[in-house]
């Protein structure tokens, strides 16, 4: 059995190589002071001062800039405080305790970040620009291959470019070139589209909660309420068409968001820009809400006209005709249109024209169209992949929308039937 030899060796006298391996130097050393382990390895044996481990004492940090070591005549600089490291040229208020010593708190780190006004006034230096631009950059941008479908603003496509990293006012023109007018226009259209979708939802909810029923239990709305709802819905439909034109042709969106005739309605034959998936959902939701609203309103209008038709045949006076006005403000060649059948025919033609425009700009297939237009140019905003999903949903009769709107496939077929009924009744 071999004997174990013990020898007294101070840990602080171990060389750097032995200390790194968590060993102690063997007692045999040559004339140069090289330990046996380093001598056998053929490497230089060096002994440095061991660094203290653990967190330094807070009260051991001197705040006057110098600290005197007892027993020595030299002065060494004090260790830097966290505030001096974090400041990096930025000025911040220094908290002073009652005894006059400087205290540091983690909350002071927020004071080192510049305010939002500094970004606008261009108060940041070039080095600070690069540091803060690094906060917005991530290597995941290249790994995930993010595109406009995940980031509508396009800010993630250039992970760390010099244009995005600059926050000074002198580079605003360069930033505006990166954020193209088309991108800003898409953001503006998305915001207006969300507002329009919310307005259509409110209109649907308000109309479905009108508690007007007849003695037999059928739903009846007064004709003046139907006329007001039709006017609001036509205005929202025109606003939706205007947004579609802006997204399709890249034109500017008016402040009121209303549709104007000078905008070109002809296709350029060029594929429209790819939209973000939330924008596609907003477009789809707005279209089918418009379909459902027109379906309910025209169904109520057909019921109202069927109720007033026997009264008109029995009465030769114009009191009944004047009482029932679908479009009371409608004028033709400067003259007010009083005939109900003519108002109905003009209303159906207007709705048909609006649906033809919406379906052409969206690129809907024939089985999802309300109008009889067969123009399938394949350059719609929704894209072929999404329209194929909608077509498969039509075949499987999936339901979209909120609780009382019903099946959107049924709404399309019912709207076609109601428009046909009103067209025959107005002849």
UniProtKB/Swiss-Prot annotation:
Molecular function in Gene Ontology: DNA binding; DNA-binding transcription factor activity, RNA polymerase II-specific; zinc ion binding
Job of this protein: Transcription factor that regulates the expression of the gene cluster that mediates the biosynthesis of the phytotoxin stemphyloxin II.
Gene behind the chain: sthR
GO cellular component: nucleus
Name by which UniProt lists this protein: Stemphyloxin II biosynthesis cluster transcription factor sthR
Pfam families, A to Z: Zn_clus
Feature: DNA-binding region: 15-45
PROSITE patterns: ZN2_CY6_FUNGAL_1, ZN2_CY6_FUNGAL_2
Signal peptide: none
Annotated spans, Disordered: 51-70
Subcellular location as annotated: Nucleus
Biased segments, Polar residues type: 59-69
Keywords carried by this UniProt record: DNA-binding, Metal-binding, Nucleus, Transcription, Transcription regulation, Zinc
């Amino acid at each position: 059995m071999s004997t174990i030899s013990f020898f007294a060796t101070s840990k602080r006298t171990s060389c750097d190589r032995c200390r790194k391996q968590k060993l102690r130097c063997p007692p045999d050393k040559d004339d140069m002071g090289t330990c046996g382990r380093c001598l056998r390895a053929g490497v230089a044996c060096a002994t440095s001062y061991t660094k203290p481990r653990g967190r330094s004492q807070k009260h051991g940090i001197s705040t006057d800039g110098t600290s005197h070591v007892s027993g020595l005549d030299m002065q060494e600089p004090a260790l830097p405080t966290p505030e001096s490291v974090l400041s990096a040229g930025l000025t911040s208020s220094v908290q002073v305790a009652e005894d006059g010593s400087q205290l540091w708190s983690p909350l002071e780190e927020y004071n080192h970040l510049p305010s939002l006004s500094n970004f606008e006034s261009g108060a940041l230096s070039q080095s600070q620009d690069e540091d803060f631009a690094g906060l917005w950059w991530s290597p995941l941008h290249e790994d995930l291959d993010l595109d406009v479908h995940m980031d509508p603003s396009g800010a993630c496509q250039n992970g760390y470019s010099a244009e995005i990293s600059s926050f000074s006012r002198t580079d605003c023109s360069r930033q505006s070139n990166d954020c193209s007018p088309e991108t800003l226009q898409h953001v503006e259209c998305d915001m207006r589209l969300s507002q329009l979708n919310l307005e259509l939802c409110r209109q649907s909810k308000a109309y479905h909660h009108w508690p007007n029923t007849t003695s037999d239990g059928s739903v009846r709305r007064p004709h003046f309420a139907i006329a007001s709802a039709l006017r609001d819905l036509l205005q929202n439909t025109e606003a939706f068409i205007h947004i579609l034109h802006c997204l399709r042709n890249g034109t500017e969106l008016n402040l009121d968001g209303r549709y104007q005739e000078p905008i070109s309605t002809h296709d350029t034959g060029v594929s429209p820009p790819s939209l973000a998936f939330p924008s596609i959902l907003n477009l789809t939701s707005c279209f089918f809400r418009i379909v459902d609203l027109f379906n309910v309103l025209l169904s109520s209008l057909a019921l109202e006209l069927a109720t007033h038709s026997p009264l008109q045949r029995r009465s030769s006076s114009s009191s009944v005709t004047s009482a029932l006005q679908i479009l009371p403000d409608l004028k033709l060649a400067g003259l007010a249109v009083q005939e109900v059948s003519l108002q109905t025919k003009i209303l159906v033609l207007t709705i048909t024209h609006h649906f033809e425009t919406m379906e052409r700009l969206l690129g809907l297939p024939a089985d999802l169209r309300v109008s009889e237009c067969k123009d399938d140019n394949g350059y719609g905003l929704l894209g072929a992949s999404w329209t194929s999903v909608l077509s498969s949903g039509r075949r499987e009769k999936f339901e979209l929308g909120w609780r009382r709107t019903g099946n959107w496939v049924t709404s399309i077929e019912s709207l076609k039937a109601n428009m046909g009924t009103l067209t025959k009744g107005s002849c």
